[in-house]
UniProtKB/Swiss-Prot annotation:
This is Large ribosomal subunit protein bL12. It comes from the Bacteria. The lineage of its organism: Bacteria, Bacillati, Cyanobacteriota, Cyanophyceae, Synechococcales. One of its GO terms (cellular component) is cytosolic large ribosomal subunit. It comes from Prochlorococcus marinus (strain MIT 9215). InterPro entries: Ribosomal_bL12, Ribosomal_bL12_C, Ribosomal_bL12_C/ClpS-like, Ribosomal_bL12_oligo, Ribosomal_bL12_oligo_N_sf. Homodimer. Part of the ribosomal stalk of the 50S ribosomal subunit. Forms a multimeric L10(L12)X complex, where L10 forms an elongated spine to which 2 to 4 L12 dimers bind in a sequential fashion. Binds GTP-bound translation factors. One of its GO terms (molecular function) is structural constituent of ribosome.
Amino acid sequence: MSAKTEEILESLKSLSLLEASELVKQIEEAFGVSAAASAGVVMAAPGAAGGDGDDGAAEEKTEFDVVLESFDAAAKIKVLKVVRNATGLGLGDAKTLVESAPKTVKEGIAKADAESLKKEIEEAGGKVTLK
């Protein structure tokens, strides 16, 4: 790597989750791209190369949305912590998201990541669906 790219990488490593989230939003706006769409294209490629068409419906779904449907009021803080860690949102934004359930927590993520996040939220006291 060049010195410039190494310097940028080191700067990125020092960002907080909130700063990284803001950076992604700014990059999306500046370049007219979407981070979720880029990940989806990469994930769709292996499924597209795989088949003879017989197992189509099972392989077509490569992106999932994690939707917080509801949560146990006694577990609100636990659910809030999991949502904050997963999204990189600040406390106020994460609180608003959790309190406005049903609400999408993450969009367009891989099945394994979606199931893992669903399990985490459910263990914290939330009810989640994958779409």
